[in-house]
Amino acid sequence: MAGVLVIGGGLAGAAAALRLASAGRTVTLWERERTPAHKICGEFLSWEAQAHLAALGLDLEALGAVAIERVRLATARRVAEAPLGFTARSLTRRALDSALLELAAAAGATVERGVIAREVRADGTVASSHGGTRPETLIVATGKHELRGIGRDGAGTLNGQLGFKAYLRLLPAQRRALDGHVELCLFQGGYAGLQMVEREAANLCFLVSPERWKRLGGDFAGLLADLGAEVPLLGQRLAGAVPLLDRPLAISGVPYGYLHRPAPGETGWRLGDQAAVIPSFTGDGMSLALHSARLATTALLTGAGPADYLAWLARDAGGAIWRATALQRWSSTGGWAERAVALLGLAPGLVRLAAGFTRLQPAAVRRALAG
């Protein structure tokens, strides 16, 4: 296959296809889903993510993105809130990914839906549900899905939790209380994020321990009730809430803290979660995916190689990933969450300080967008 093959139509893959096609490159993108689909994601768009999307020509307002100005932290005994220091946005991945893919197609990329990549072989051939091909340039942006032959080594990462996501219709009073906020609820063995998205739906996305899931017999309704009983604020929000999906989305084995280190002679390009996975409480996962796409396409368009790109990514994101992962490890110690929320109540400005340690730096974003 001549040109570039992008595997995966999420944020990183779609952004890469869009930028390369706009630069005149021949690009084919494979997306496993035949139609727009929901994905496990907190759907919090930080200012960094918004800057990358604006550079790609995406209009979040036109898509109905919801504004978020404040963060509210809750534990079993405490609640505290603070301004974010910027206006975040919230938009379903189904709407966001679809819009990016439409822009990529309009720029000249060939978008093929319903194609499932199965393996990358040693000779560079990619086997798929529609046959095999050997692309001139391969970009792997499969998100949380592993691809045989080019998997991630999760050793040393935080990959033991279970992830769930549900959309809910909250009671009017609870919806009003949540408007303009992202709520982070901290409980034993995990945490949950809750925020409004478009069409007056609420996104509940959370991580729990396998032990809790097993103790509750694998019952999702029972799990929500258990979490709501531990964190009263979450219980208030969930009271009377109506699920909007037939069943929740679920995932396991996500290697939080992963940062890809290239093997000698490695020629493929990894983007998004296939290159780096930052703990989701930072709200920077989508920003990091878009940042990786920007760096990789800059490398491709300027004649640099995968090793150069990965070095740039490690320079920009390695410290934040390490610090966020260390913070998540620390959060599992007894009493940490209560102390953290109490401290935030006394000093709301700590939110900005914490964000500075666990997110991409403004200089890194400016440098990437200038490339």
Region spans (language model):
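Glycine-rich FAD pyrophosphate-binding loop
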Residues: 7, 18-41
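C-terminal helical "tail/cap" subdomain of flavin- and related membrane-associated enzymes
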Residues: 298-371
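Predominantly flavin-linked oxidoreductase catalytic cores and closely associated redox partners
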Residues: 103-237
